Amino acid sequence: MSPYLAAEDLSMFGTDPWWLVVIKAVFCFAFLMVTVLFSIVWERKVVAWMQLRIGPNRHGPWGMLQSLADGIKLMLKEDLIVKRADKAVYVLAPIVAAIPAFMAIAVIPFGPAGNEVSIFGHRTAMQLTDLPIAMLFILAVASVGIYGIVLAGWSSGSTYPLLGGLRSCAQMISYEIAMGAAFASVFLYSGSMSTSEIVAQQDDRWYIVLLPVSFILYVVTMIGETNRAPFDMPESEGDLVGGFNTEYSSIKFAMFMLAEYVNMVTVSAVATTLFLGGWRAPWPVSTFWEGANHGWWPLLWFTVKVQLLLFFFIWLRGTLPRVRYDQLMKLGWKVLIPVSLVWLMLVATVRALRNENYDFADIALYIGGGVLALLLLSFVVDIFREKGKRAEEPVEEPAAFDPMAGGFPVPPMPGQELPPVPRRRPRRERELIVSGGPDTQSDGPAGGSTDGKEASDG
């Protein structure tokens, strides 16, 4: 690891012929689309298994063509535009949301940076391109996609989409800061912002081991950035009908759905690159097989890691309930941002100590990472525990109905009952009271001690 940030050697990029660049761009697009089609079916299958159902099984073998059938159905539906919508922005919003989702994959490495594979006789890297500030490019592109959601909510001319757009904007602002801090810790420790160089620095240990807090922070923020459960507040069906895309139909609605799943694949690919060794084979495989990281095999390891993270998305959706909006904001501003800033300071300190050739830097990083990871998990558990305590609090019984509360008799509403009418005292008790005897009704239970014979003497 280089002790200081320096310009990386990216000479292997920019030398491919134009037709090879087009082929690699088409491959990146096809990788995203095929992964999205598979992920939709995979999600429906996994959720069905969790709910003891069968899931899609009609179109294609094992229902694998269900996503393709749904896409064709959406494109053939009638395209409606509401009267109060700003038509130009209304049509532009799905495009603004979808295009940035495809851009980040351009700097993700699928294999070693060296010329490892041959395509039609040309040796080339398994990456479309790389930049000295590739991760800043990914962070900037992720921020642009939110404009599509905000514009969709504003241009629809409806209340529910507007609220969904505002929620999405607030959620992005709250979680983008913690995501940037998680990225910055990786930059500091690896000494590079190039994606290929970050993967190269993980040859001995993945950053999920060295930077566990950064990994946890990024996983939480990537769920918030993609508006997935349990952080899907911008499209909460319970209070916003459908959220920002309520007024959309046909291919425009399909573009929003496509952008959501492409973003899931993109953030999973970024997590794989930053923390899971990228295209590198897992430790047992790379130890016993020297050729595991050569040829086309890195593409397999990269795809498997991305699919595992996509399964994590699906697992969260099937197990965790949607959090309240105030809990979402509290987690972002009071937990993630403070923890990310403290962790960033610790990583910067360890980086400075490593530059001075101190040996205890890794130990301090491990200890500090473990402590902060436990604190972060405890904060998250406390939020859900507080929610459970509130649900278990005893509900106060409503006050008894008073028919004369307003000064005049009022009939009871449905669910209300009139207070019991006091029974008339028996004649013997009335005579005793007049003669100065004890009041048995006030000393005993309500209604007095009566029998049928005395009650008939009233």
Label for each model-derived stretch:
Residues S2-G458:
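Selective transmembrane helix interface/packing segments
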